[in-house]
Amino acid sequence: VTVDDAIDVLQEEVTEDIEKMAAMLPGDKPYLKTGIFETWKARTPWLMLLMLSATFTGIILTHFEKSLMACAILTSFIPMLSGTGGNSGTQASTAVIRALSLGEVRFSDLFQVLWKEFWVSVCCGLCLAAANFVKMMLVDRWLLQNPTVTPQVALVVCATLVGTVLCAKLVGCSLPLLAKRIGFDPAVMASPFITTIVDALSLLIYFRFASAILGL
């Protein structure tokens, strides 16, 4: 086996992993040589599945529609919470998928991984919440003169931020291990579903805190 052959194999493996993590069926042709129909066929199944699974987010929003109407300012923070949760989950899943591929962790290490990510998420969540509270008070309330951004609203958002980061990292680190355990490719199983799961969880946490703190 020549060095060039080995490099070609490595490139193909890396490309396949990247495509899997982006919710695409792996292809064996260069991008410009892959036909439109082939590309469509590789991308549509996962997009369809993720679109259907994302309806849970819509159901949650519909269920708490009255809360949103009573405190409309809550709506403006949903993208930030969902984005932060998705990014947090992706960080954890990427680290675990890489560790699995290198043989650094196994399913038997699940609780050790969860314990580590729990404390990482607590530290990250508290740091993000503190920064966000300052931003909401100084920028949103004082600089932009938005009276609807009250300390109570900021508390709801920041508490949700901590809970979302915690759930996202625990989901992100456990899904690849569970996928490996049941015989699925961790990159295929974990990455596409993390954002969908975290979006739903973050909304549930958000509206529960809003109900408890704001009395909605």
Features from the language model and the residues they span:
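Alpha-helical transmembrane segments in multi-pass membrane proteins
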Residues: 46-54, 58, 77, 81, ...
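Membrane-water interface of transmembrane alpha-helices in multipass transporters/channels
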Residues: 63-78, 144-156, 187
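Membrane-interface alpha-helices at helix entry/exit sites of multi-pass transporters
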Residues: 105-119
